[in-house]
């Protein structure tokens, strides 16, 4: 009898784990990025190699990058970066960075981040964004 109960508990745990892994596999971070009067939705899937995630260019001088780690649990996070791009400077100066625990807690109208404004001081540029966690990739 105890053996049968243990077997049922094991099967239940395996099914729950598989369902959780399947749900997480379809998740994306969707950021609503506004720059120059236009809003684009940029989506990112979970990655195992954060250093390979390329930034998305907005205008001539701004770049936005989403790094979504959902495992291992102790490193799970969502990191958002905004960089400036100047021809006379080597590299890309970081002008804004935000880190959120995974899974994030929705903060209301503007997803889990709230509405953010990244300011580039040389040219006076502003990039606005807010992000949400989606259950599957939008088409």
Predicted region positions:
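Bacterial N-terminal signal peptides that target proteins for export
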Residues: 1-11
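Hydrophobic h-region of N-terminal signal peptides that target proteins for export
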Residues: 13-23
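Cysteine-centric segments in proteins
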Residues: 26-139
């Amino acid at each position: 009898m105890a053996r049968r109960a243990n077997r049922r508990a094991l099967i239940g745990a395996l099914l729950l784990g598989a369902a959780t892994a399947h749900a997480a596999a379809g998740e994306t971070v969707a950021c609503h990025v506004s720059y120059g009067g236009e809003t684009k939705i940029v989506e990112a899937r979970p990655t195992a190699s954060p250093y390979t995630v390329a930034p998305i260019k907005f205008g001539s001088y701004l770049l936005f990058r989403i790094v979504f780690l959902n495992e291992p649990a102790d490193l799970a996070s969502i990191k958002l970066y905004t960089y400036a791009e100047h021809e006379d400077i080597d590299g890309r100066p970081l002008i804004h960075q935000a880190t959120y625990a995974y899974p994030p807690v929705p903060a209301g109208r503007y997803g889990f981040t709230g509405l953010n404004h990244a300011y580039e001081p040389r040219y006076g540029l502003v990039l606005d964004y807010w992000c949400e966690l989606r259950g599957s990739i939008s088409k």
